[in-house]
Each structure stands twice: as structure tokens, then as C-alpha cells.
Curated annotation (Swiss-Prot), chain A:
One of its GO terms (cellular component) is eukaryotic 48S preinitiation complex. It comes from the Eukaryota. WD repeats lie at residues 8-49, 51-89, 188-227, 229-268, 285-324. Component of the eukaryotic translation initiation factor 3 (eIF-3) complex. The keyword Oxidoreductase does not apply. It comes from Caenorhabditis elegans. This is Eukaryotic translation initiation factor 3 subunit I. One of its GO terms (biological process) is cytoplasmic translational initiation.
Curated annotation (Swiss-Prot), chain B:
The keyword RNA-binding applies. It is found in: Cytoplasm. It comes from Caenorhabditis elegans. Component of the eukaryotic translation initiation factor 3 (eIF-3) complex. One of its GO terms (biological process) is formation of cytoplasmic translation initiation complex. This is Eukaryotic translation initiation factor 3 subunit G. Changing residue 130 to Y: In ju807; represses the convulsive behavior due to cholinergic hyperexcitation caused by an acr-2 mutant. No effect on binding to target 5-UTRs. InterPro entries: eIF3_g (IPR017334), eIF3g_N (IPR024675), eIF3G_RRM (IPR034240), Nucleotide-bd_a/b_plait_sf (IPR012677), RBD_domain_sf (IPR035979), RRM_dom (IPR000504). Gene3D superfamilies: 3.30.70.330. Pfam families: eIF3g, RRM_1. The gene is eif-3.G. Residues 182-260 form the RRM domain.
Length: 327, 262
């Protein structure tokens, strides 16, 4: 594997994503500038300037015309992906933690953090309704939680959303019936859910948690199907689009490393078999924990973002492409 | 290089000026596998540079939307940058090998290491005897075996101490024999005489190894006799011959052979 190493961020990465065709890579970090890159040669096209704090999440619409960023400066911004202009700004009283587009690209969901008297919230806004996209606009879906919502994701068209919480709880809401969650799973994880990613065909969810496991979930009822155990907190997990493989990335936080008796390390990305729940391969590269990762739609590339501020685009070689899992 | 080689046997070179001119012309060569090597010359601040670029042209079918996105204009921090990757943001990192923990035969390769790590991480109990992490020392199932081992170790230590002290029977006997053979007894010793004076007196005869003045256990006063050990028996004999009956202070010394105690 001859990886590309992209240095466009000054601080730790928080999210990398591919667009639908996989030719662009979107990344954001704890500095203020989300970036967009060509996946093929690692060329940076531009940065979206305007945020005033750490950018926690970025998402791109299906047609790669818009992208949305959630930031610690209490705003969610929607950008023109091609020109880098800010189209809309959504304000709130507390930092924004995650954001995502719906399947059609018309709805934007985001979660806000719990802070002093403000509860953690999950909101959805419609980009087509101009009254929702102005300063002081109201979301058409609004839900409050006592515990921090860490990640949110549209899991079925424009109707169902799944929210992961700091306590390990997972909840699924139907936007057409906003009162109560339609599915709840509180036993899948014991600690914070760090990442939720959908499989490319939309039939599975994978959740990564700080309890050193990642779980494969049924997208329709949040039932746990498989569990993948690691030796380190899992910060991100992704599913291969064309093979039964799972990739986990994680590692101890920098501030925790000196407090553990075990030597530091284990910053590799690990590849597991989806069905047999066993690790069969690993590759290293980052000097520090892996904070986020995404699998390319072609199945031959994985992008990882690390605590060291680098994005690595790893293209698999023949060893992996020719590998068959013997059981 | 190929051009230079081709030029060497060329008969039409008639002057050095023409040859130099040909060498300075930019040209392109094509390799067998489709790679192209482009050679160009540039002059910066009066210094001529030869720039060799090697690349490969690949035609790839992509969806139209992907082809359209290839024409995006740079914005933000990259405003005004030319097309192509920039060295400030993009570079090819070192080769990374993917490690397979299960080879094609399905064997687990890294299992032992991982198990150790896991045990270390999770267990707080530690056994001194078998170094395991799943129980305390008092509950060790192999305690009896390890205790026997410990007793054997203790015996070894004791033996070591004996050897270190030099308490072997052979060594002791040899030392005692030598000491008794070369020792003479001094009686009628004045009380005022101390060890230094005695050493001075007997040192004239030969090398003195040991001097022992007998003292009362309670009062600490000399008892009036002493033992002097010489290095060789000849010295002891000479001391007896010369120092017997000499007058020290107000007493007449009596120097004679030591009688064996056993």
C-alpha cells in the first residue's frame, strides 16, 4: 500500500467523508477550515472559511452540490460545495456535535451538546423552507435529551434517523411521528457512541464505541447482529461496500496514554470479517489515534483521519484484494 | 541519454556549436510501458537547470458528474493555486504493508501476544509464584511445587555463603596448621607493652602476621602473655633464639614455642 498523506489541517481530524461517487474527499478538523480534496491524487480543491471554532462533523449531499458542517462555535453552516460560499447559518446556544444530510439532500439534521441549563437536542431543518433557514428560525423536528447526543444519521430516506448517545444508548426516531422514539437499544454499548455509519446499501448500521467494541445493527429495529472486539477504544468504524469486511480505527486518547500501565501504541486500523467477527488484517500509519475513517465506494480505498492532523488515503494492494477468509 | 547515444555516431555533426545547440533542445521520449520522460531546460538567475519529468498518461472512464468536478476552481486557502497536487498539502507517504493475522491456512498468528496484552490490561491479581494474572499468590494452585523450588534456592544460597566465608574444612585445617607452626608464645610480658611495641620488637626478626595480647575479660588489662605469629617457621625460631630472656621495661621476656591446644 502506497498511501497518500494529506496535510491540510493544523489540528486533530474529526471527520472524513467521501461523496457518493467517491471522487471527492471532505474532511474537517479541530481547526476552523473544512477541506475538500480530489481522492485520486490528493489534490486540495479548497477550504470552507467562515467557522470560528472546531468543526466536529461534515457531510455532503448526494449530488455534491452542498455540504454541511457542525462546529463548536454554536453554528451549523451549509456551503456551496463547489465555490466555497456559505449559504445558510443555523445558530444555537450550545456547540454543535454532528450533522448530516438526508437521502434527498433537502433535510439537515444536527445534534447539539448539553451545557449548563441547555439540554442536548436533536433538530432537523428543511432547506426548502426559507423560514427555517434564517436567523432565529425554528426546526420542524426538535427533541431534547438529558444525556449528550454524540452522533446522528439519516438511516432511511428522509424519514428515519438514528441517534447515538454518550451513555451508549441508541434511539431511532420517525420524523413523521415526533413524540417518541420508535426503537431503542440501550444494551449494545456501555460507553459513548463515537461514530455511526451506514453500510452503502443501507441495510446495516455500524456503531463504534469507547467500550472497545463496534456493533453491527439492523437498520430497521436497531437489533445487534454482530460485535467486533478491539483492545482499544474504537473511534470509528466503516463497512466495505463490496465485501464482508469491517474496518475499525481508534486508540487511547492522548491524555489517557500516560495513565495506563500498558505501553502506548496500537494505532493500527484493524479489518474484521463481518460475519465471523474475527480480525484478520491490520495496517498502521498514523502517529496517534485514528479519529475517523471512511471506506471508498469502490471498496479499494480507505481514508483515515488521525489525531496527528493528517489524512491518509490508503489504497489496498493485491494481498488484500486476493485475500479469502478461510473458515 | 538515448539522444546522446544516438548523436555520437551521427556523421552530420560538423561543429561543437551545433552539438551544444542540439543537446539544449527540449525533447520527449516514450517508454515501452507508456511512460513518458520529458526533458526541459530552464534558466534561473543565470543558472541553467535541466528538468526531467517522468509521467504516464492514463485515460479513464468516469461518470460525467465526476468529469465535471475535475474542472472545479480552487477556493478558500487554495485560491490561485495551479492545477495538480501541491507539495505543501499532499505527499506520498512510505510504503505500508498490511499485516494478516490469519494466513491463508487460517492459523492465528498474533493470538498469544494479544492474549497477554488483554490479561495484563484486565487483571489486577498477580501471583508471585507462577507469575499468572488470574489469582493471588495465596490461592496459587501450583504453590506446593513453587515452594519446593524456593527451598532448593535457599539451600543454594546457604552453600554460597559458606563458600564465601571460606569455611571449608580443608581451608580451615590448613590455616590452623600454619598458624600453630609459626606461632611463638611470649610470657612475662610487661603490662605497659602494647601491640605496636611488640610488633616493632618482633618485626626486626621477620614478617609478623598476627599479634594477640591476652587481656582480662572484665578489666581489660593485659594478662601478661601474648602470641606472635610469623610468616615462616624459621623467623619464629630465630625470634625464640634472639629475644628470649631480653629485658623490656622491668621484666625479662620468655619467648618459646606455642604448645598445641589440642
Amino acid at each position: 500500500m502506497r498511501p497518500l498523506s494529506l496535510k491540510g489541517h493544523e489540528r486533530a481530524l474529526t471527520r472524513v467523508r467521501f461523496n457518493r461517487e467517491g471522487d471527492l474527499t471532505f474532511s474537517c478538523a479541530k481547526d476552523k477550515k473544512p477541506c475538500v480534496w480530489y481522492t485520486e491524487n490528493g489534490e486540495r480543491i479548497g477550504s470552507y472559511d467562515g467557522h470560528n471554532g472546531a468543526v466536529w462533523d461534515i457531510d455532503v449531499s448526494w449530488d455534491t452540490t452542498k455540504c454541511v458542517t457542525a462546529s463548536g462555535d454554536l453554528t451549523v453552516k451549509i456551503w456551496d460545495a463547489e465555490l466555497g460560499n456559505c449559504l445558510y447559518t443555523i445558530n444555537h446556544q450550545t456547540p454543535m456535535k454532528s450533522c448530516g444530510f438526508s437521502y434527498s439532500g433537502n433535510l439537515v439534521c444536527f445534534t447539539t451538546q448539553k451545557m449548563t441549563k441547555n439540554l442536548s437536542t436533536f433538530q432537523v431543518r428543511d432547506l426548502r423552507d426559507s423560514s427555517q433557514m434564517v436567523e432565529g428560525g425554528e426546526s420542524f423536528f426538535y427533541s431534547q435529551f438529558d444525556v449528550n447526543a454524540t452522533t446522528a444519521l439519516f438511516t432511511q430516506m428522509d424519514d428515519l434517523v438514528t441517534i447515538g448517545f454518550e451513555s451508549g444508548l441508541l434511539q431511532q426516531y420517525d420524523l413523521r411521528n415526533p413524540d417518541t422514539p420508535i426503537h431503542t437499544n440501550e444494551s449494545v454499548h456501555r460507553y459513548s457512541v463515537q461514530d455511526l455509519q451506514l453500510s452503502p446499501r443501507g441495510d446495516f448500521l455500524i456503531s463504534a464505541s469507547r467500550d472497545k467494541t463496534a456493533a453491527l445493527l439492523d437498520v430497521n429495529d436497531l437489533k445487534k447482529l454482530k460485535q467486533y472486539k478491539s483492545e482499544r477504544p474504537v473511534n470509528s468504524a466503516c463497512i466495505s461496500p463490496n465485501r464482508d469486511h469491517i474496518c475499525l480505527g481508534g486508540g487511547e486518547d492522548a491524555m489517557q496514554v500516560t495513565q495506563t500501565s500498558v505501553s502506548a501504541g496500537h494505532f493500527e486500523a484493524k479489518i474484521y470479517h463481518m460475519v465471523f467477527e474475527e480480525e484478520f488484517a491490520r495496517f498502521k500509519g498514523h502517529f496517534g489515534p485514528i479519529n475517523t475513517m471512511a471506506w471508498h465506494p469502490s471498496g479499494t480505498i480507505i481514508a483515515t483521519g488521525g489525531e496527528d492532523g493528517y489524512i491518509r488515503i490508503q489504497e489496498f494492494d493485491e494481498d488484500y484484494l486476493g485475500f479469502t477468509y478461510d473458515f | 541519454m538515448t539522444g546522446i547515444n544516438a548523436m555520437a555516431p551521427a556523421p552530420e555533426v560538423v561543429s561543437w556549436a551545433e552539438a551544444v545547440e542540439q543537446d539544449n533542445a527540449p525533447h520527449i521520449q516514450e517508454g515501452a510501458d507508456g511512460t513518458r520522460t520529458e526533458t526541459a531546460f530552464t534558466e534561473v538567475d543565470g543558472v541553467r537547470w535541466k528538468v526531467v519529468t517522468q509521467f504516464k498518461v492514463i485515460n479513464k472512464r468516469v461518470p460525467k458528474v465526476v468529469a465535471d468536478r475535475k474542472k472545479w476552481v480552487k477556493f478558500g486557502s487554495c485560491k490561485g493555486e495551479p492545477a495538480g497536487p501541491q507539495v505543501a498539502t499532499t505527499y506520498v507517504a512510505e510504503e505500508v504493508d498490511m499485516q494478516f493475522t490469519r494466513n491463508r491456512a487460517g492459523e492465528q498468528i498474533l493470538d498469544v501476544q494479544e492474549d497477554k496484552q488483554t490479561a495484563k490490561t484486565t487483571s489486577r491479581e498477580h501471583c508471585r509464584h507462577c507469575k499468572g494474572n488470574d489469582h493471588w499468590s495465596t490461592h496459587c494452585p501450583y504453590k506446593v511445587m513453587y515452594q519446593l523450588d524456593e527451598e532448593a534456592d535457599a539451600d543454594k544460597d546457604t552453600e554460597k555463603d559458606r563458600m564465601a566465608m571460606g569455611m571449608r574444612p580443608d581451608g580451615r585445617q590448613i590455616d590452623r596448621n600454619r598458624s600453630d607452626e609459626n606461632t611463638c608464645r611470649v610470657t612475662n610480658l610487661p603490662q605497659e607493652m602494647n601491640e605496636d611495641e611488640l610488633r616493632d620488637l618482633f618485626g626486626k626478626i621477620g614478617r609478623v602476621i598476627r599479634i594477640f595480647i591476652a587481656r582480662d575479660k572484665v578489666t581489660g588489662l593485659p594478662k601478661g602473655f601474648a602470641f606472635v605469629t610469623f610468616e615462616s617457621r624459621d623467623d619464629a625460631a630465630r625470634a625464640i633464639a634472639e629475644l628470649n630472656d631480653i629485658r623490656m621495661y622491668h621484666m625479662v621476656l620468655k619467648v618459646e614455642w606455642t604448645r598445641p591446644s589440642n
